[in-house]
């Protein structure tokens, strides 16, 4: 015996008179049928199967056993034009099943289009089929339906949020517009009092024809602007101080580096040993005779007329003893020219030594 596996094909007789058993696996996917129609269809299949087995038993000498695994549920396969294509490509879950009659022998027994099984099932029907759609179109349809349902809810939420945003934008656009007189009066009031108590707030609002809340908000904004400006001024001042300190610190670091370099460098001069002061002989004479040097200076400063007189007096007062000699006797005769006074001796030159 030969076993052939096929999906949805009818039972065929192989060459040589042998029976080719066909394993029919039917999966009903889609809408179910009612219980009564299923029972009637099952009875018809049993009758047709019995007739076929009798014919095959008469034609075949060997005993044959029929294995039928066809479910009692309705087999909804494509029509005759698409039967060969379905048999060739097998079971396609992406293709929507048809609602026509499934059995090839039962097409003639159908009573007409009005006798098509109703696409409904009851929860109490134990033999009814369950609706299950695995096709891509069905999945896409469910996804689109869910998206439309969610989009409807989300659209409502978006519309409500957009409406609230519009309301907020309208309230934001409705800013307080003050006239020049009102602004000037509020500025003067702020200079006098940066904060207001409730009584002052009500009085000022009544005077300016405003609400107390508007006056309070204006004062809050004015205090915030004043604080911001003061903060900016302080920030600029601190920035300048920081820059000055940075420059001073850089200068001090530079001086410190120079001092360290001088400390570690080798000195350019050698320390000379201690020595004694030496004086030249002329300086020593000047230092030993201070009185002589002091008296000789006024004598040199006198007039030239008084100098011969003083020299003559000195020569007369202290005459030196004269010892005659043979050579002097030869020239004992008096000289014919008068004796002149001795020229004063110039003072010694000053010494250059220290």
From Swiss-Prot:
Stated name of the protein: Homeobox-leucine zipper protein HOX27
Annotation: DNA-binding region: 171-230
Subcellular location(s) of the protein: Nucleus
Tissue and organ expression note: Expressed in seedlings, roots, stems, leaf sheaths and blades and panicles.
Keyword Isomerase (UniProt): no
Gene3D superfamilies xrefs: Homeodomain-like
Residue span of region Leucine-zipper: 229-273
Family: Belongs to the HD-ZIP homeobox family. Class II subfamily.
Keyword list, A-Z: DNA-binding, Homeobox, Nucleus, Transcription, Transcription regulation
Gene name per UniProt: HOX27
Segments for region (Disordered): 98-175, 294-323
Species annotation: Oryza sativa subsp. japonica (Rice)
Function comment: Probable transcription factor.
Cellular-component GO terms for this entry: nucleus
Entry-linked InterPro entries: HD, HD-ZIP_Homeobox_LZ_Class_II, Homeobox_CS, Homeodomain-like_sf, Leu_zip_homeo
UniProt keyword Nucleus, yes or no: yes
SMART domains: HALZ (SM00340), HOX (SM00389)
């Amino acid at each position: 015996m030969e076993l052939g596996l096929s999906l949805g094909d009818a039972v065929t007789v192989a060459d040589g008179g042998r029976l080719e058993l066909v394993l029919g696996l039917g999966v009903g996917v889609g809408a179910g049928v009612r219980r009564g129609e299923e029972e009637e269809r099952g009875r018809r299949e049993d009758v047709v199967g019995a007739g076929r087995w009798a014919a095959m038993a008469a034609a075949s000498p060997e005993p044959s056993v029929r294995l039928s695994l066809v479910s009692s549920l309705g087999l909804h396969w494509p029509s005759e034009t698409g039967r060969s294509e379905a048999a060739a490509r097998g079971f396609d879950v992406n293709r929507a099943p048809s609602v026509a009659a499934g059995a090839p022998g039962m097409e003639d027994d159908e009573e007409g289009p009005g006798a098509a099984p109703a696409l409904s099932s009851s929860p109490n029907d134990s033999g009814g089929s369950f609706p299950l759609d695995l096709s891509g179109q069905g999945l896409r349809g469910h996804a689109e339906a869910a998206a439309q349902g969610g989009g409807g809810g989300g659209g409502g939420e978006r519309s409500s949020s957009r409406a609230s945003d519009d309301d907020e934008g309208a309230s934001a656009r409705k800013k307080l517009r003050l006239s020049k007189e009102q602004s000037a009066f509020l500025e003067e009031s702020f200079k006098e009092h940066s904060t207001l108590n409730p009584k002052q707030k009500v009085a000022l609002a009544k005077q300016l024809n405003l609400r107390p809340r508007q006056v309070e908000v204006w004062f809050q904004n004015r205090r915030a602007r004043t604080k911001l400006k003061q903060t900016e001024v302080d920030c600029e001042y601190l920035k300048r101080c920081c820059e000055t300190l940075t420059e001073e610190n850089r200068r001090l670091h530079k001086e410190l580096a120079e001092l360290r370099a001088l400390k570690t460098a080798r000195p350019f001069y050698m320390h000379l040993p201690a020595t004694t002061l030496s004086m030249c002989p002329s300086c020593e004479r000047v230092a030993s005779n201070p009185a002589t040097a002091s008296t000789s200076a006024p004598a040199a400063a006198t007039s030239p007329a008084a100098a011969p007189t003083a020299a003559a007096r000195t020569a007369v007062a202290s005459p030196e003893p004269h010892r005659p000699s043979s050579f002097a006797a030869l020239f004992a005769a008096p000289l014919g020219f008068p004796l002149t006074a001795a020229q004063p001796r110039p003072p010694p030159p000053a010494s250059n030594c220290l």
